[in-house]
Amino acid sequence: MIRSELIQKIADENPHLYQRDVERIVNTVFEEVTNAMSRGDRVELRGFGAFSVKKRDARVGRNPRTGETVHVEEKHVPFFKTGKLLRDRLNGKEE
């Protein structure tokens, strides 16, 4: 599912809301999650999961094509840990 499909689905299930308002809400949610994570904050959505930022240390890597060793800089990467309700639903354990 892509962002436009999510917006359409929410708008279809909430006919009292205009699609442009739903789009604004969805965009705001994504923007706030992005802002929080860029500050290093953890974003937890109970039952769904938690978004956080993990630090990957600098390391020596290898170019798979040439075999040459290369220095890989330290970086921060997004991390998502699923919540129990989401995990259960994915594994067919719906309540």
UniProtKB/Swiss-Prot annotation:
Keywords: DNA recombination, DNA-binding, Transcription, Transcription regulation, Translation regulation
Gene Ontology molecular function terms on file: DNA binding; structural constituent of chromatin
Pfam families: Bac_DNA_binding
Quaternary structure and interacting proteins, as annotated: Heterodimer of an alpha and a beta chain.
Gene that produces this protein: ihfB
GO biological process: DNA recombination; regulation of DNA-templated transcription; regulation of translation
GO CC, any one term: chromosome
Family: Belongs to the bacterial histone-like protein family.
Function in brief: This protein is one of the two subunits of integration host factor, a specific DNA-binding protein that functions in genetic recombination as well as in transcriptional and translational control.
Protein name per Swiss-Prot or TrEMBL: Integration host factor subunit beta
Keyword flag rRNA-binding: no
